[in-house]
Amino acid sequence: MDIQNIRAFLMVAETQSFSRAAEKLFLTQPAISKRIATLEDSLDCQLFDRLGKNIQLTQAGQALIPSYQRILSEINETRRIISTLRSEVSGHLKFGTSHHIGLHRLPPILKKYTKLYHQVELDIQFMDSEQAAALILKGSIELALITLPDEIENHLSTIPVWTDTMFCVVAKDHVLAKQKYVTIKQLSEHGVLLQAQSTHTRDIIDQALKLNPEIKIIMESNYLETIKAMIQNGLGWGVLPESMIDGSLHRLNIKGVKMERHLGVLLHASRTLSSSANALLETLKNSN
């Protein structure tokens, strides 16, 4: 049922004139007449009696007025609600984040976000990048803040937010810390603590360093904080983002090696985001 036809019917009923109804709706009289005729055809009944220059509602027309007024009122209320949702940021926001972003990038963002949008209830889940993609496709979470892959699945899209430069590091008293420059061959002679296989960060490391398959891997972990703690205690060397390298670690100089990863937002390309999710994206955008 066409809402414009209902509006035309109610205006003709109110003014008892096709010409006056046309003026009020900024239409031509033939356009008003066509809308009424279309409505009558769809209902298979006559709504107005044409009595010369005068018109009069039929019994069917009179019966329809309360229903059509209620329909228009409900439509206007629905539009008001949608407009309010667009202007007011509230509700429930469920999203995922990697442990690294959740610990090192997200806290100042959330501090600003919760101050601006205190009515939003946050549900933050820590997860791997691969798990986040599956949950977004399933619709379980709206978005995720993760290490962005070079290639993404169909129906997903990404928004880069941060660039993480990564370096090989050792403890201050590690034998490699005494070297001005270190080669890949020298790295391969020492035990290493690496990110877990099949993670995007591990793929970047493997492509950049092309390590000997026989290298001694002391430990693999998804948690960079765990890897950092092990390196600090002299268990081996590893790769960490610049933001995690402090005075307890020594950065190794390796000629020709550059490692970068991109952190940002992963979301469903076809999903309409809530006002709270859009507000988070805006906060992230303004954070850089």
Task: List the predicted regions and their residue ranges.
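A short LG(V/I)-centered, amphipathic sequence patch enriched
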Residues: E40-L57
